[in-house]
């Protein structure tokens, strides 16, 4: 028997649908993602912390869920909004249905939604604070009013430091390589790993670590608030700054650590939130975007070669190109809206990219950035 669910937005919009997953109430910033595949990777991406994700592709859950296609240990998104949940999940890798997976992780979802209407609203008005009520919480004459109250009570992501919330609690080593059919994820612990990389976990996606490990990196992952002196004492060949959720500006601990690294000649590579933090540490500024970039088909141009790459994106903040100091150079730009996508320091071996070269989900056109990072470490030796 189906259960009711309500999605309310801070502007007063109310949507009714069917509850999937857990019962109860959740709130967060409502965003939309245009990727056609990879819903499990999207849900488990820590960058979606405190966000309710609307998937624009109409059929979600067709292939179920498995234990391999995860980017973290649990679902990070605050909620899920979809058009249609198929009754049957069909895949030789399927271990669980999407609805059971959501319920097991105590995450709310709403199906049978007019996602096209919702997406157009978010596109035109910008990302909205919202709330989902599911199951018994969505019943009663005052349900809509309670949903609206919860939506308007959410403080929004501007000024919210979430990197230290989703980060690991203790340092750990990583030795899992890339996935292949029939073999799963490779164990690279016994292989040749000439480069020691210390990776800051601001909300790390696992596929980033896999792609670095596959390129000969011995990885030590450290919590977001690890002081620079502790990292430098590890004598790394390179320092990686991960993706993550929330506003980069409140992350003073990260910015000060990166500034210390930039006083050395150690190569630094940042992705997503790490890109924004590198920019802030170098003197640039960031801005909250209207509705952000969330999808797997975003064209980005390499400003040096002119080459266009299709990229995976997931961010609601961006570096303001007009604020770049003289020691920062723009190297990538979005062909959707012209926003800055990549920077490099002109005086230090440091660069970053706003999108996700590791994909998961999405294309790997930008994966050579990992090779560039490895080459920088090789050149420094």
UniProtKB/Swiss-Prot annotation:
Key words, A-Z: Amino-acid biosynthesis, Arginine biosynthesis, ATP-binding, Glutamine amidotransferase, Ligase, Nucleotide-binding, Pyrimidine biosynthesis
Catalytic activity: hydrogencarbonate + L-glutamine + 2 ATP + H2O = carbamoyl phosphate + L-glutamate + 2 ADP + phosphate + 2 H(+)
CDD domains cross-referenced by the UniProt entry: GATase1_CPSase (cd01744)
Key word Repeat present: no
Active site: 272 (nucleophile), 356, 358
Pathway field: Amino-acid biosynthesis; L-arginine biosynthesis; carbamoyl phosphate from bicarbonate: step 1/1; Pyrimidine metabolism; UMP biosynthesis via de novo pathway; (S)-dihydroorotate from bicarbonate: step 1/3
HAMAP family per record: CPSase_S_chain (MF_01209)
Family named by the database record: Belongs to the CarA family.
Protein name: Carbamoyl phosphate synthase small chain
Lineage of origin: Bacteria, Pseudomonadati, Pseudomonadota, Gammaproteobacteria, Oceanospirillales
């Amino acid at each position: 028997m189906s259960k009711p669910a309500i999605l309310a937005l801070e502007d007063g919009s109310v949507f009714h649908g069917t509850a999937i997953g857990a019962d109860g109430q959740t709130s967060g910033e409502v965003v939309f993602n245009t990727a056609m595949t990879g819903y499990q990777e999207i849900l488990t991406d820590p960058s979606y912390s405190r966000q309710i994700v609307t998937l624009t592709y109409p059929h979600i859950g067709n292939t179920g869920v498995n234990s391999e296609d995860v980017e973290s240990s649990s679902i990070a998104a605050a909620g899920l909004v979809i058009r249609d949940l198929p009754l049957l999940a069909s895949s030789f890798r399927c271990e669980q249905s999407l609805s059971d997976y959501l319920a097991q992780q105590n995450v709310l979802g709403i199906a049978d939604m007019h996602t096209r209407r919702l997406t157009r609203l978010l596109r035109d008005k910008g990302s909205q604070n919202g709330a989902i009520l599911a199951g018994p919480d969505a019943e009663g004459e005052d349900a809509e009013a309670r949903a609206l109250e919860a939506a308007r009570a959410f403080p929004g992501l501007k000024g919210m430091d979430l990197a230290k919330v989703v980060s690991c609690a203790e340092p750990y080593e990583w030795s899992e390589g890339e996935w292949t059919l029939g073999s799963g994820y490779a164990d690279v612990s016994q292989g040749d790993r000439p480069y020691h990389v210390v990776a800051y976990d601001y909300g790390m996606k696992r596929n980033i670590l896999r792609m670095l490990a596959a390129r000969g990196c011995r990885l030590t992952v450290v919590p977001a608030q690890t002081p620079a002196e502790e990292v430098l004492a590890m004598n790394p060949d390179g320092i990686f700054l991960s993706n993550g959720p929330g506003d980069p500006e409140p992350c003073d601990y990260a910015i000060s650590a990166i500034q210390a690294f930039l006083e050395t000649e150690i190569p630094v590579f940042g992705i997503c939130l790490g890109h924004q933090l590198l920019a802030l540490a170098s003197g640039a500024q960031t801005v909250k975007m209207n509705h952000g970039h969330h999808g797997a088909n975003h064209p980005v141009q390499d400003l040096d070669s002119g080459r266009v790459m299709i990229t995976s994106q997931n961010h609601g903040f961006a570096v303001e190109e007009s604020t770049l100091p003289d020691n920062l150079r723009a190297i990538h730009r979005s062909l959707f809206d012209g926003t800055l996508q990549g920077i490099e320091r002109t005086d230090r071996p440091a660069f970053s990219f706003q999108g996700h070269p590791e994909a998961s989900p999405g294309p790997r056109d930008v994966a050579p950035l990992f090779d560039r990072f490895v080459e920088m470490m090789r050149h420094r030796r």
